[in-house]
């Protein structure tokens, strides 16, 4: 325990906002610069979108191999063969094959488009879906939109009874697009302990207080390496799952843009 304390004290000196360490279901170390203050977790949001997709598939709203263009009115008339072969799994694995990443970072603030769904479907697909990894916010965004259209509840409202209530997390603040859809690729705000519950749920393969909240099979599939991700700028990353990063040594993580991490170690 003294080593944990020393480690946390070292991290505090370099200016981190918070850290929690959980082992065997118990918190063994925690620091929060501002107690319980929620902060933007950026792309960690994607892993919550992954969980929402798991619930949606289990409830029969769509399937992993459902064709994306058949699920959106904006795409019905698209004739491009690559667009028409694109499946839900390609949105989850960052293998849509778009010509360029879109809806990234600060570019959303200056984007003149008000209809982001139509904007996505106007993009060129230059690689066969499923063949090339390209980190892109378009896929997670479409997944959040799809769930809202299928259920008439936005991503937060959809996850509240299925996930947040179970974990005793008050509904999270989120980023919204101009049309009122929760941005499924970034913007969720939570504190360290709330994020820790999410990681613990995944470590426990979807079980919480004796209840199977999320499919064990879905967690296994979404956190294992589905695709290679090339020369990612983290030497511990060795692949990508369904909106989760797979790490060397049987571990995985949700990862935000500015040093936000939720790392799950199975050992």
Where are the regions a protein language model picked out?
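Solvent-exposed loop and edge beta-strand segments that line ligand/cofactor-binding
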Residues: 37, 41, 79-82, 128-135, ...
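Active-site helix/loop module of the DD-peptidase/beta-lactamase fold
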Residues: 60-94, 98, 122, 150-190
């Amino acid at each position: 325990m003294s080593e944990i304390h020393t480690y946390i004290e070292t991290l505090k000196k370099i200016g981190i906002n918070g850290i929690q360490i959980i082992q065997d279901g118990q918190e063994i170390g925690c620091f929060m610069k501002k107690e319980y203050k929620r902060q933007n977790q950026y792309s960690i949001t994607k892993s919550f979108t992954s969980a929402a997709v798991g619930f949606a598939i289990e409830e029969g709203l769509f399937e992993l191999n459902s064709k994306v263009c058949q699920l959106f009115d904006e795409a019905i008339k698209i004739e491009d063969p690559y667009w028409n072969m694109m499946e839900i799994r390609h949105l989850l694995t960052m293998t849509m094959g778009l010509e360029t990443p879109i809806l990234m970072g600060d570019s959303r603030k200056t984007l003149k488009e008000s209809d982001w769904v139509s904007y996505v479907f106007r993009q060129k697909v230059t690689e066969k879906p499923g063949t090339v990894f390209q980190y892109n916010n378009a896929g997670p965004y479409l997944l959040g939109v799809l769930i809202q259209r299928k259920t008439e509840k936005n991503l937060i409202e959809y996850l509240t009874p299925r996930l947040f209530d179970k974990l005793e997390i008050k509904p999270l603040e989120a980023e919204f697009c101009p049309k009122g859809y929760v941005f499924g690729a970034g913007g969720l705000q939570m504190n360290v302990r709330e994020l820790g519950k999410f990681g613990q749920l995944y470590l426990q393969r979807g079980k919480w207080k004796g209840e199977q909240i999320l499919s064990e099979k879905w967690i296994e599939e979404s956190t294992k390496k589905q695709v290679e991700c090339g020369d990612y700028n983290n030497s511990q990353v060795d692949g990508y799952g369904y909106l989760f990063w797979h790490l060397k040594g049987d571990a995985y993580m949700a990862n935000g843009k500015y040093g936000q991490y939720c790392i799950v170690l199975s050992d």
